[in-house]
Amino acid sequence: CLHVNRAHAQRCLPGMRGIQLTGGLSDNMRWKNGDGFGYHAGIAVSTYTKNAHHWVVGVEYLEKRYGYRDCLYPASQFTGEGGYYLNFLSDRKKTFFAALGLSALAGYETVNWGESLLPDGSRLTDEDNFIYGGALTLELSAYVTDKIVLLVNGRQRVLFGGDCGKFHTQVGVGIRFMIR
């Protein structure tokens, strides 16, 4: 009797690393550029521990646009992130994963790139500030190959110290390239 078994590569082993690129919509989740339009983009390094849990360290840019008299003015946040993601669901072949992450964030917020005077003579009262806080993330990942992982995530950021709101909801997609 001949048995043919399929070999699967080992995935999510302790010490494995990946570089991930993410992006998506923020806050109002509008596709159209206009008042309330927000987006984010980030790059991070993931390092796996036991049970497919992983550490994430990276940077992110978030921009939300506010309308005033037919013009759009950006509020931008540059943040660094350090967090831990707990894998709570995966299939037997280790192709699909679901993880819940908690991260610390710190960075800088700028409103209209530091320009407080608007073209009509009005003055912005919001200022540039250092910001700090955290994020709760739900991440779904699927291995396309042994080295390429597709990501879908939703997260809630809570940031203090800024003038443009404490809560920011994000929905995004990404790709992780396993490098080691």
Task: Identify the meaning behind each predicted range.
Residues R6-G58, K64, G172, R176-R180:
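Short glycine/proline- and aromatic-enriched beta-strand/turn motifs that initiate or cap beta-hairpins
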Residues N28-W31, Y66-Y73, D120-D126, V158-G162:
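Extracellular loop and loop/strand-boundary signature of outer-membrane beta-barrel proteins
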Residues G15-R17, N33-A41, L72-G80, F96, ...:
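Residues that define the transmembrane beta-barrel architecture of outer-membrane proteins
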Residues A44-P119, I148, F177-R180:
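Gram-negative (and chloroplast) outer-membrane scaffold detector with strong preference
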